[in-house]
Amino acid sequence: MSTVQTVLGAITPNLLGRTLTHEHVALDFEHFFRPPPADFERELQAKISMSTLGYVRMYPYSSKENVRFYDEEALEAAKKDVLLYKKHGGGSIVENSSYGLKRNLEFIVDLAKSTGVHFIAGTGHYIHAVQDASHASLTVEQMSDLYSKDIITGIQVNGETVKCGFIGEVASVYPVHEFEKHSLQAAGEIQEVLGCGVSLHPHRVTNAPFEIMRLYMEAGGRANKCVMSHLDRTIFDIDELLEFAKLGCYMQYDLFGTECSYYQLNSTINMLSDGQRIDNLMKLIEEGLVDRLLMSHDIHTKHRLTSYGGHGYHHIHMNILPRMFAKGVTIEQVEQMTVTNPANWLAFNP
């Protein structure tokens, strides 16, 4: 029987409930720090407060405090927001922090125990630039062995065995680095063997999702068990989205709540608003693709948590879904995207 592997053990897919398929509750994002504009350096070096929050929202990666999404203040704020997510109908969170992002399995397990939210942890590798020497030198075979071990055997956390429930997020730059080609190959090989879900992170150019799907599928990975993340900052043209949809993977809009006029990680991108995200999802639903769609926030900086003036993990449930209903999306379509699709993606029989 197929089950979903949470950090507290395997459960049947019907127990997941509403699921956020791409989140982080603790990670190190300091590699992506960008020096602040000279005129705002003082404000962005200061502690995040009401008087500096506007600067942080405009330049989120220029505040070192903001990208330190792992200190005690961040963990406390994340836990508060997971509890709010639970209060407002959330059932499960897929934690996408992979090797290179310094995932905190101990904290994830604690959250699962203390909040009642199901957490699914990932294995896999983030981009080459954030890997330490012990991981940067891994071969495809060694990566495959590691991913398989994390899922089948598990990892010891304070005397408990914690098993990963999917491979991801597997991240790459563009052109794809040789190390990242290896991690995509390993992900495809292990997916073919185990049948588990995979989550891919493309670089911020339109060609990237097509290229990494090719590499993953050539290694044996099944498209219908793979999620392409961050499409709301990668493929903007609907015709190109429909062309990409022919590959058969899940298409994920996972930056809900990120509404900014200047996207620091690629200044040529006009970041979508939540309204535009909804409109794009509705167009894809009209094309018969509701069974391929997923939604999330990809929270990875402090300013997106409610303790720092942000929207929290309950934003989709409280603010986006009501707007979707008002625009004509049905409850059945929402349930498909937030309950059924995540369960189908995550369920496997190891």
Curated annotation (Swiss-Prot):
A divalent metal cation 2 binds at E169, H201, H230. Pfam families: PTE (PF02126). The keyword Metal-binding applies. Its EC number is 3.1.-.-. CDD domains: PTE. A divalent metal cation 1 binds at H22, H24, E169, D298. InterPro entries: AryldialkylPase_Zn-BS, Metal_Hydrolase, Phosphotriesterase. One of its GO terms (molecular function) is zinc ion binding. The keyword Metal-binding applies. Keywords: Hydrolase, Metal-binding. Belongs to the metallo-dependent hydrolases superfamily. Phosphotriesterase family. This is Phosphotriesterase-related protein. It comes from Drosophila willistoni.
